[in-house]
Amino acid sequence: MKEVFITNPSIAQEINTKTEEKLHQSVTITMIRNENPTATLGQFISHTTYQDLPEEVVKQAKRCILDLIGAAIGGSRTQVGKLLVGFIEECRTPKESTIPGWKVKASSPYAALATGSMAQDLELDDVNRMSHMHPGVSTIPTALSLCEREKKSGRDLITSTVVGYEVVNRIGKSVSPSILRDTVFHPAVLWAFGSIASACKVFGMDTEKCVNALGMGSLAPVAVEDPFRQGVMVKDLYGGWPNFVGIMCSILAMKGFTGSRVLIESDLGIAKVVSKKYDFSSIVKDLGRTFEIMNSGFKPYAACRRAHSAIDATFEILRRNKIDPKKIQRIDVGTFCAASRLSNTHPESSVAAKYSIPYAIALAILKGKVWIEEFDQNMLKDERILALAKKVRVHLDEELDRLYDSKWPALVKIELEDGNKYSSQVDWPKGEPESPLTDEEIKSKFVSTASTIIGKEN
């Protein structure tokens, strides 16, 4: 691939570069040096086509779309879903885009808002562990709603999804891992960039307009961590609101509204707001050659992804040993910093329970699964579960924390009353590229989440 490097942002405009060959079907774009990542991403969005996507990337995009739609349909009849759809119907917006799980249409921003929030509610949306992004929830709702509105094809849906994943994950990687070492949930602050990228691709916007749209991406909310600990509904809006913002920014840019051309890299830009460390080279390295969507981790459990290694380690102990839950004296969980905060032993809401490693481990031991119904409000009153959760101690393990974020490790130790001890360490939770879910497992997950709403026969 030929690459033309431009260092002057003032001439980083729409440039058509043609190459004599493509390397592994990679995207033909003009690259701008690392000090201009906002403009680089704008060009990537504008220039990328379906033909640029390798076969395995297309397949992965289909998996991601199916997974997200299943999570959204599953969350459509939760209290969050019902309240949001009721509110949106009261707004009487144009009937442009379908809200999954409902025979309701709304304007694209509102439909994407609902879809993202509903998908976030069940804690089943995908995660990129290296960027700490939830790329599906911040990208696919936008792509779905706008492709329906604009009457686009399935290929357009796939392309806009891949582009959104690429942009939001690369920005996330540039400020990781310190992004999760704070009281602000910075990933949600960045999610609008995925929505913006997807929207710009659906609209077919040129580089200049894409850059302006990205330059408005800081309008996403300052998403603090407290709602996760409190277990309140607003945390689900962290998944929905960036889609609303992203569509709005893209439409405004399409009409001529301007944003910062250096929003990501400026000394007053978004990177310096969300992280103490950043490396912009990760934004442009191999852009168009490797695709971040391939690094998505799919969730097999309805809980915060940071808890999954501990859940897997618990299941591994149970597979190897016959353990009587009544004989458990204590359970010790050492893990990385961001996961060690999930230490609540007595969650009072289903949301809080999904962010509790002690509760999840108790479910694994007593119920043999950690799925949607295990987080029902009535289950939170189960004295056996609560009593076992109180025996779980979660703490920061400095050695394991040094492996973060290339690994998300957890070491679980179970000690019985007779003194016997059992342990297991998991470095990559099930569903990561190193331990992937099969196509059949992803399909089964979709059926499990969606069938209660649309029926298995559909």
Regions found by a protein language model. Give the residues of each.
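Terminal-appendage/accessory-domain detector
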Residues: 4-132, 229, 234-244, 251-458
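Structural motif corresponding to the C-terminal cap of alpha-helices
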Residues: 49, 122-126, 146, 150, ...
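Hydrophobic mid-domain F-helix/FG-region of cytochrome P450s
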Residues: 64-71, 143, 190-201, 361
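Hydrophobic alpha-helical hairpins/lids featuring a short glycine-rich hinge
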Residues: 120-173
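Active-site nucleophile and cofactor-binding loops and adjacent substrate-binding regions
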Residues: 130-137, 157-161, 179-192, 235-239, ...
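Active-site cavity-forming subdomains of large catalytic enzyme subunits
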Residues: 150-156, 173-183, 196-213, 224-236, ...
